[in-house]
Amino acid sequence: NRCRRQRQMCIRDRLKPYLDECIGLVHCQEKALWHDYYKIAGRVDCIAEWDGVLSVIDFKTSTKEREDSWNENYYIQASAYAEMYQERTLQEIEQIVILVVTEDGTVQEFVKKKHQYLHLLDKELNMYYNTVKTGI
């Protein structure tokens, strides 16, 4: 338990300068969301202004630095949260932010536009629901 607390403190200490500089008004943290049409639910890490733009902000840890191409599922997930939040609040979120802290303390910031990933979200959901229907 002590090691876990120390690791969490390290992550917090590494992220703090980024958060102090870039984060603005926080709309929610660790909030349960759902989407009636998509029939999905989840718990978003944070919805806040990032560099002045309302954003879904997701925090990740990694053993090593990540290539942008490795993050596609994270972008799809964050886009889903943006859609869920919009359905619940009628506030549109166009920007998604993934913050990754590696074991050596490196912080990576990936900022994307939600619309780039909505077709992939639709594709993933269609594949899932087709699997559920067919039982395969």
Residue ranges and their predicted role:
Residues 1-2, 21, 88-91:
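Structural motif
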Residues 3, 25, 38-40:
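Residue-level preference for beta-strand/loop junctions
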Residues 8, 24-27, 75-79:
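A short linear-motif detector with a strong N-terminal bias
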Residues 12-34:
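Short, conserved active-site entrance elements at the starts or edges of catalytic domains
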